[in-house]
Amino acid sequence: MKSPLGMGATSGVTWAGFGKDASRLRAQRGECRFVPVRGTQSFKMAERPEPLRLGSTAPNFKAETTNGPIDFHEFIGDNWVVLFSHPEDYTPVCTTELGAFAKLEPEFAKRGAKLIGLSANTIDSHSGWIKDINEVSGSNLTFPIIGDKQRQVALLYDMIDHQDATNVDSKGIAFTIRSVFIIDPKKKIRLILSYPASTGRNSAEVLRVLDSLQTGDKYRVTTPINWVPGDDVIVAPPVSNEEAKKLFPEFRIVKPYLRFTPLPKEKATVS
């Protein structure tokens, strides 16, 4: 199958269920192609895929990772998954980010969530770089990192930066941006974040959002600004006051549309 970048045969990634039938890929995600920008070596996306939105089914793919080959939907299984991309291996901001995620991996695991990284580098590059990450951060990085040299998964998930002229490789082709996707066990996308290449992410914030999503799914509540587990939550608007009295005996009305409540003690911790 011809690479979406027009650079020949693919390597490391295949479109699960598509084989060599590119038309089926176009039907699923919209046709995307690259054209050279006159006077530069960079490439500009002429037609971008249909954007993924909150609630979209996470597109499936097969890829090589530092932990071996995966089918993404099989990798998700019955778990939550945090899929995140970084621009390039052996770079300063990315090194600090992956070290931080590696240190928090046990906390994600407690919540039934898997981590998986991605960049437009080879598996060999990832494997060598992991040694640096562990040395610099004092971490033990064990989660898989996808080798997406041809940017196929990056295109599928719209992780390509086509505005920042500094975020390109030696051929002028755009690197991946700092994208984050939280995907639930039903394979639905629940969070999408995009950071510029110059700005490192906050791994604790990704964990906080996961806590919020899991709490909201389990109980009929939403979470206010800066919420962390143990703080009061907000009774969801569809819940009537009569229902709220049964569900949350300690709820209080601040405004008719704003009702706070602590979760019962046994409900305060997200499993």
What residue spans do the PLM features occupy?
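N-terminal chloroplast transit peptides
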Residues: 2-10
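Acidic, Ala/Val/Gly-enriched low-complexity intrinsically disordered segments
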Residues: 9, 13-16, 21-22, 27, ...
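Chalcogenol-based redox active-site neighborhoods
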Residues: 17, 32-271
